[in-house]
Amino acid sequence: NKKISCVKKDGTRFSQEYDKVILATGSKQIMLDIPGNNLANIFSIKNFPNAKEIFKALDDSTIKKVGIIGAGYIGVEIAEAIRKRGKEVYLFDVADRVLSTYYDRSFSDKVEEILSKNGIHLCLSESPKKYLGRKKIEKIVTTSGTQYSMDMVVQAIGFLSNSPIGEKELLRDVSGAYLTNEYQQTNIKDIYAIGDCATTFFTSINRSSVDFSISNALRTAYIATQHINNQDFTPSGSQFTNGFSIFNYNFYAAGLNLKTARLLSESIDYIEIE
């Protein structure tokens, strides 16, 4: 009696029997619900088609000032790419430093130094309160009360798991992702979940959490398919490993940074090696 109820785009309904199911429904972008969010030249970026749309818009010679909302990996990397197109770039984040969830301050200070050296304006400890303009974006008003003239905005704030299937049957974690075990099985053993829509086991914290990355999507897909094919293996778990490059500098990290670790435990010891 294992069936999936489906609805086609034209509204037609049908049922499909299954032996195993893999949910790979991905994630959806967090959008700012503020006045002016519907103005032209305000973009979001999650995938390659979004990036193509943004870079096509940059061909407009009247676009000179671009605001990037969110100083995580995507925000920092898109800021670099747009700066290399000759635009004046402003990078906003509510935190007091860039990449605050990934790196300790000594590393993020270095990233900020590189960004500033290459002409990117850092607007930290502030975020947009509203967007102003007649038809197109003209100004960003931030939580600090400052107004920035702007010709274009790219929102790179973050993601939420897209997990609408099995609302009553499948368990979620606090973030809304499908809760899975070390083999990516949900609470219904023949239904697996992988990638952005699912949790995965992290050795750093000894529990499951969400990792919105391509490498995690590939890794969890491998784990699920190996288990479905009855391969004898034990997943090693993830270690929050990540990396990125800006202006010919490469940065890598594995495990938790000090800020995140202190949220999980009050007694944290650490050393710095240079």
Region annotations inferred by a language model:
Residues 1-8, 16, 84-180, 269:
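A Rossmann-like FAD-binding core segment of flavoenzymes
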Residues 23-24, 142, 155, 193:
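Redox-cofactor binding/interface segments in oxidoreductases and associated redox assembly factors
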Residues 38-62, 147-223:
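FAD-site-proximal beta/loop scaffold in flavoenzymes
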